Each structure stands twice: as C-alpha cells, then as structure tokens.
C-alpha cells in the first residue's frame, strides 16, 4: 500500500472519515460539528490516529485481511480495479474487529462488502462521501445490518438483469464487474 492508502485507512478507522483532508483537521483540533478549533481535542485526535495506525500496521491483522480477500477469490492484485475498495474493506475489517465482532461475521461481511463495492462502483466518483455515509451507518446500526440494507437497495433484480449486464459490455480490460466475475 502507498502512504496515501495508509493515511486513508487510518482516517476511516480513527475518525470515520474518507477524505485525507479530514486528518489534518482532526489533528489540528477542529471540531467537525462546530467547525471551531479546540486545542483540547488535539491529544485525543493524535491518540486515535496512532491507535488506528498501530492496528493497521499489525502484521497479524494485515495477513488475516489478505486471507479474507483471497477467500473471496481475489488471489491476484490485478483483479482489483479500485484500490479504494480494498482500503474501505480493510478499514471495515479493523473497525469490526475493534468492535468485537466474531471472526465468522467479520469474514462474511468484509467479503460481501468488498464484492458489493466492486460490482456497484461505490469506490469510484465521490467515493469519500459514500464511505463516510456508510461508516456513519455502521456506527449507528452495525456493519451486518448496514450491508444488508445496501444490498437490498442496490443489488435489486434490476441491477442483476439490466445494470450489471450493461456494465459487463465493455472493451475496457479493467472493468471492475468483469474482474469481480473472474475472482
């Protein structure tokens, strides 16, 4: 992973934010609700970011995450058209583990979420906004319930019958839907 990937994942884990610019704001003591600088927020912001970085860099966590990704069929990095999808999946993995979710739930939800992101294209365009919205919902109602709601609303019969087949008709060699099919 690049340093940008590391900062993005740590930001999602520590602050539930997808934009890199939010890291600077958090570490500067900016209160996201009031938009005022509060110096007393700085130590906690640094502690949260450090904790996220330590979890992210733990070899055990990274290898466990790679095992989950490979069990979903993604055995080669060339099967990914979006590093942002992988970043979100790793952040989700770390968040669920920190929340005490069982290994079987983490494995299932992370696999399904990764495939859903790649099939629907949620990791392209203004993905930071979608990721932040998803992270907020995960904090409020849990990852499994949030995923089930997203699957129900986005992976409809119309998606499978019309949207996905039309996305598969592409001459691009980095078509995310086709690469997901290969996985």
Task: Label every model-predicted segment.
Residues 118-183:
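Intrinsically disordered, low-complexity N-proximal targeting/linker segments that flank membranes
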